[in-house]
Amino acid sequence: IVHALRDEGIAIDPMGPLFLKGHKRASLLSEDGGCLEWLDKQMSSSVIYASFGSNVKISLEEVHELALGLEDSQQPFLLVIRPDLVLDNTISDALPTDFLSRTKERGRVSTWVPQLDVLSHDAIGGFLTHCGWNSTLESIWNGKPLIGCPRESEQNTNLKCLVDWNVAIPVDVGKNKVNLKKDLVTKAIHKLMYTSEGQRVRKKMLEFKEVARCAMESGHSRSSLNKLVQDIKEMSLGRKPDFL
């Protein structure tokens, strides 16, 4: 794609991911720092982290199905339920009856978490996500395989790419592409954690992690940044940069 755009005379220099340096938390939601201490007590690569980002909203029924799917999977889980994920519902109202008491030994529910810290934690074995691009990049950087459940805009395209790259397992919601069902959530988790397909996805994601880090340290991202700086210098001196 980059080469095709350049052939059309478009100046493009891909850089990133850009969240690594000088990252400042921008969310107004209070973060559950205690979740990191909880993760410290879990086995390596055992926890399913489930979060739908800062903007996506889902129905009360789907939150119930998601929660029950996590429960039925028998995996430890960290579930994020934003205050506005389901309108007019508190965390306790948004979850199935007695869910918190039934899962307190192997699950944690938070309103918001420090996602980069969570994804870099050794205990995380998979990330159940809406496939927003920020979450996707953060997961790739940390080598955490994805369970994809896109909701809107570019997220379906993102998941299609991730599945084609063999770094994600989709939650198969059928033609409707919206309604979560607990058995489908459980099936996707089991596929990632216990099947040969899941093993391939985990292995491939670790390869993507290395590619991303090489791009930042000495690869395309670094060379693109250096080229951009050089082009700006040339223009400041009244010279014609390479892309013109």
Identify the role of each PLM range.
Residues I1-L244:
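Catalytic core of nucleotide-sugar-dependent glycosyltransferases
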